Amino acid sequence: MERKYNVAVVGAGHAGCEASLACARMGLKTLIITLNADSMARMPCNPAVGGIAKGQMVREIDAMGGEIGRITDRAVLQFKMLNSSRGPAVWSPRAQCDKELYSVLMSKSVQNQQNLEILQSEATSLTVKNGKVCGVKILTGETIEADAVVITTGTFLKGTIHLGKMHFNGGRFNEVSALYLSKSLIEDCGLKLGRFKTTTTPRINSRSIDYSKMTEQFGDEKPVPFSYSTKVEEWRKNLKQLSCWLTYTNPITHKIVSDNLGLSSIYIGEVNSKSPRYCPSIEEKIERYPEKTSHHVFVEPEGYNTNEVYLNGLYTGLPFNLQQQMINSIVGLENAKVIRYGYAIEYDYSSPLQIKKTLETKTVKNLFLGGQINGTTGYEEAAAQGFVAGVNAGLKVLGKTPFILERNESYIGILVDDITTKGMDEPYRMFTSRAEYRLSIRNDNADLRLMDAGHSIGLISDKAYKKFELYRKAFTDICENNAENLPDDEDLSPWSIEKAKEEVYIHKKYEGYIEIQNKMINKMKKSKDRKIPEDFDYNKLKSLSAETKQRLFEVRPQTIGQASRICAIKPSDIAILTVYLEKQKKERKQKKHNKIK
């Protein structure tokens, strides 16, 4: 049987699901190829969606017609707005999820989507003719013809699992890895691949935990859903939130770990690749911060119908017997029983300097990459790239203008710009500090910023868009003190007048600050040619992180512009450096003036 599609998506994780749904909803005949049709959109690490800057990206995907926000709202166990004690610009929604329910709901969404088919198989190579991809070869030897291909392989690309000194092939524990595709990406597509690693935590039985010794962490009293389409009051009524719990490691825990570093797969030479700096294993934390006597361990439920509990903060590559000892040394976990052991996983990734801002490869036309294959880490970063790659694959097939989000429009735009411009030498994670426009690209205004784009692509229906236009007009009228003939909530639903008023309050609060922000950004752009002294001591800049100082000392940039292009250097770092150099210049000028006097 001949199989021919407009778009073929390889991989059915968070990136692959968003990519395939976007293409199918754009009216394109789409195929998603997965190693296991029963494990789509799994949460193999933390069973949560959102967080600092990540929650903003989920809202952005939702505002443009993506799926992750809607599914999260239906699978949520607990909701918290992070940074709520600070200004709204950095408020970040986060939801603890029922991991099985999330996977089931996303899988159902993919299965029920018109124009979208699923095939369980392994993609072994790509067919490339005259510099353009035209198909995917699968394990059976069959070739799937496709006008465009999106690769979203996650940790499965030559994935290797390490547990102490044990190591074996796998994309996740008990799941096979994709062994053949890497060779084709190198030989047929001319891509350079590297290796990254990450670790996950042990899961324990909730019945073996003494919660009375821990601090209970409640969800928000008035949770706010991720998706604009979720009706807030109805959702809150039906939401049964579960608590998370907080405990800590201690000197005994640290001694068990430090005495056995040589047995961890992270240190015995089995895993030589870089891991996420901001999601370190417990081994790395204890080695990196020997002065600390404790580290947080968040004890998080994994679902309504399971006793499995996730130990957030105990990512590890230690042998299983030492994992048990380590866990039992922690207060409240003295009698804890392990259900699944933590492990390290290594996988292939492609340097994102080899892709355009559309996420199309520079070496092969109509081939797009999304998610961890681009060197990022996190479900949200993956979903965002999957969405962008899927949309652009669809637009390329349709012969339409590419879809590119800019840094001043969205966190997704910042993510794509960062990875395609600066590249990386360790897994990339999104933070609010990476966003110079964070005062204007908040989580609360994602719909106002991006729903026009979603509608123009064809992922927001005309019906939903008409409601949105009514809401936007209400927002504008309230802003301009013209609130006499506002529509009823019934006409605005799922938006409301209350939501519009809240948005106006935040908008007015930040109006002046946004002007200052934009002036500062323009000043930074103008100062890109400013020289940095060769012997400049970055330790003088107390506001810079240790990572930033390390990068600047390593590269020794000659100008502000060069410094801004260094991997992992954030706009906030450049602002600090620019202000300091400006201050130094003024001081020198003043000294010179005083001498003349």
Curated annotation (Swiss-Prot):
The cofactor named in the record is: FAD
InterPro entries, sorted? FAD/NAD-bd_sf, MnmG, MnmG-rel, MnmG-rel_CS, MnmG_C, MnmG_C_subdom, MnmG_C_subdom_sf, MnmG_N
Give the UniProt keywords, A-Z.
Cytoplasm, FAD, Flavoprotein, NAD, tRNA processing
Spell out the molecular function terms from Gene Ontology: flavin adenine dinucleotide binding
Name the Pfam families on file: GIDA, SAM_GIDA_C
Gene3D superfamilies, sorted: FAD/NAD(P)-binding domain, GidA associated domain, C-terminal subdomain
Q: Which domain of life is it from?
A: Bacteria
Q: Where in the cell is it found?
A: Cytoplasm
GO cellular component assignments? cytosol
Q: Provide the residue positions that the database annotates as binding NAD(+).
A: 275-289
Record bears the keyword NAD: yes
tRNA processing listed as a keyword: yes
Record-listed FAD binding positions: 11-16
Just give the chief location class: cytoplasm
Q: Name one GO biological process term.
A: tRNA wobble uridine modification
Q: Which HAMAP family match?
A: MnmG_GidA (MF_00129)
Q: Which family does it belong to?
A: Belongs to the MnmG family.
Q: How is this protein organized at the quaternary level?
A: Homodimer. Heterotetramer of two MnmE and two MnmG subunits.
The task this protein performs is described as: NAD-binding protein involved in the addition of a carboxymethylaminomethyl (cmnm) group at the wobble position (U34) of certain tRNAs, forming tRNA-cmnm(5)s(2)U34.
> What name appears for this protein in its UniProt entry?
tRNA uridine 5-carboxymethylaminomethyl modification enzyme MnmG
Give the organism the record lists.
Endomicrobium trichonymphae
